[in-house]
């Protein structure tokens, strides 16, 4: 496995942490639900979060490809800076409880009876905005962007699925830790892009 593929896998894991944290919160709020309900919720979390996290970096990549022509010499600094800012934002959110606030604002009491697709869509978009910004940096990695976005989607879907079950069994105490890990990985990749691209 080459270094670029390792970078994409690390980027995918870091970007998946927002969706993972939200999935843990959704799972924790579904602790009294039936196994069939939790399975449906886990499948929907995987689908919504995976698709959103796969499409948004592709949009960022395409926009970045246009901008790189104009900003070629500054691109590594801009791309690395974006990743560092996103990582710092994730750390800030982890230490200020913003994931819990998103869940509380978007949580519909009816989710206990039926999965709210509008809420799932909103959460998927909210957790994937960072992925669109990170997609810009895919232009700086020597890897097929389509493959990278597919890897990001698959990794996020897996984290979304298992996050529901982890939240159901352990509660919300892991949410912030997932955000911290994701933030640190994004900062590390950002520094690498700035220094070695």
Swiss-Prot record:
It is found in: Cell inner membrane. The keyword Thylakoid does not apply. The chain crosses the membrane at residues 8-28, 43-63, 66-86, 123-143, 146-166, 177-197. GO terms for molecular function: manganese ion transmembrane transporter activity. GO terms for cellular component: plasma membrane. Keywords: Cell inner membrane, Cell membrane, Ion transport, Manganese, Membrane, Transmembrane, Transmembrane helix, Transport. Probably functions as a manganese efflux pump. Belongs to the MntP (TC 9.B.29) family. This is Putative manganese efflux pump MntP. It comes from Psychrobacter arcticus (strain DSM 17307 / VKM B-2377 / 273-4).
């Amino acid at each position: 496995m080459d270094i670029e593929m390792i970078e994409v896998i690390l980027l995918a894991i870091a970007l998946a942490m927002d969706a993972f944290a939200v999935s843990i919160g959704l799972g924790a709020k579904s602790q009294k639900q039936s196994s069939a309900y939790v399975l449906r919720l886990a499948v929907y979390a995987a689908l919504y979060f995976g698709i959103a996290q796969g499409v948004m970096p592709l949009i960022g990549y395409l926009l970045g490809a246009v901008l790189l022509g104009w900003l070629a010499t500054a691109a590594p600094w801009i791309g690395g800076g974006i990743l560092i800012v996103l990582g710092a934002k994730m750390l800030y959110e982890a230490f200020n409880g913003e994931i819990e606030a998103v869940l509380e604002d978007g949580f519909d009491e009816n989710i206990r009876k039926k999965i709210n697709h509008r809420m799932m869509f909103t959460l998927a978009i909210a957790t994937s905005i960072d992925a669109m910004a990170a997609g810009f940096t895919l232009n700086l990695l020597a890897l097929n962007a389509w493959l990278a976005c597919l890897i990001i989607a698959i990794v996020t879907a897996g984290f979304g699925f298992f996050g529901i079950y982890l939240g159901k069994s352990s509660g919300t105490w892991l949410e912030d830790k997932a955000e911290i890990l994701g933030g640190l990985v994004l900062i590390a990749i950002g520094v690498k892009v700035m220094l070695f691209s």
